[in-house]
Structure formats: structure tokens, C-alpha cells
């Protein structure tokens, strides 16, 4: 529970997979609509619809679907997945969340190991504008059909505004934001 984990808040959503329809939503702390002043102002909205966050590794499944749908790779293709991938600009790098020897991974392997470098090597082969269009079709950067008062659309900048790092990190869930 929220109390057992000493969490500030929690949310849960039940979604119909085939349609994306929200069947149920719950969050804690809750607000008594008859006495909203009984809770701090920060807890009076709905974090499910208003609190934007980076999706992180769950985005790898979205990127993998783009890779397959565009024909960029199939289930047998592999890419290098080093522990750390140095980039050709600004002394930047992409790193996996755990130290490991260099891997050569299939798309399934990238998902299994949650490899940032592997997903970058797969999904960055897709032109950024194409990936942006897929993200829009998936609903990123948009409010839900519920049009909840004060709902955040999250952040999805147009592909033309992505710098080189954003172009890469969006493949594994950074550089964009979503709500629950």
C-alpha cells in the first residue's frame, strides 16, 4: 500500500487493451468532494491525468513495434548493445542501467535486457519524423478522450525540434513525458 511503502501518492488504471478505453482509475490520497479543503491543495487534482513523467523503459515496447511495423528489422536481426555507447557529439553517451560486457542482441533480447543502447541502435534507424508520427498515432502528446479538467497532454516536441540527444533517448522513454 501507499503507507507501507512510504509513498507520497499512487495511481492505478485499468485499460481495455484492444481499444485503449479506460475502465477504472484510482489514486491515493483521495479527495472527499464534500470537503476538498481536508487535503493539501497539491492532492486535490488527479495525478493520473495531470502528473506528467518520462515513461522510461516501457517505451522500448513502443519503439520495438515501430521497428517491426516499418520493416526496419525483424525478429532475427541483431545490433550491438554495448554497456556504454559514446556518441559523436558533445562528449555525450548512452548507457544501460547495469554494467555488462558488450552484447549482440535481437529485438527480443533488447526488450529482455531492457537495453538502452540496443534500442537506440534499432530504433534510430527509423527517420525521426516517422517515429514522431508513430508517437502521435499512439497518442503521445495528446490528452485522453475523457478530456479531464486540467489534464496534461504530456510533452512531445515536434521532431524538427529534437536535438541529436533527444532523437536518440526518445527511443527508450526519455525526452518526452506522459500521464498515467
Residue ranges with predicted function:
Residues 10-55, 62-180:
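Beta-lactam-recognizing serine transpeptidase/beta-lactamase-like catalytic domain environment
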Residues 1-10:
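Conserved, well-ordered alpha-helix/loop/beta-strand core segments that scaffold catalytic motifs
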Amino acid at each position: 500500500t501507499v503507507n507501507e511503502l512510504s509513498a507520497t501518492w499512487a495511481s492505478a488504471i485499468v485499460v481495455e487493451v484492444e481499444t485503449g478505453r479506460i475502465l477504472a482509475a484510482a489514486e491515493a490520497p483521495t479527495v472527499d468532494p464534500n470537503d476538498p479543503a481536508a487535503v493539501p491543495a497539491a492532492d486535490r487534482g488527479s495525478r493520473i491525468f495531470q502528473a506528467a513523467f518520462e515513461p522510461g523503459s516501457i517505451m522500448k515496447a513502443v519503439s520495438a513495434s515501430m521497428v517491426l511495423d516499418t520493416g526496419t528489422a525483424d525478429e532475427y536481426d541483431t545490433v550491438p548493445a554495448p554497456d556504454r555507447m559514446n556518441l559523436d557529439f558533445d562528449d555525450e553517451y548512452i548507457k544501460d542501467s547495469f554494467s555488462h560486457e558488450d552484447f549482440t542482441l535481437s529485438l527480443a533480447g533488447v526488450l529482455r535486457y531492457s537495453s538502452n543502447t540496443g534500442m537506440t541502435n534499432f530504433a534510430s534507424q527509423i527517420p525521426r519524423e516517422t517515429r514522431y508520427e508513430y508517437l502521435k498515432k499512439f497518442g503521445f502528446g495528446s490528452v485522453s478522450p475523457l478530456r479531464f479538467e486540467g489534464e496534461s497532454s504530456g510533452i512531445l516536441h515536434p521532431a524538427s525540434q529534437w536535438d541529436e540527444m533527444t532523437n536518440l533517448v526518445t527511443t527508450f522513454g526519455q525526452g518526452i513525458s506522459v500521464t498515467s
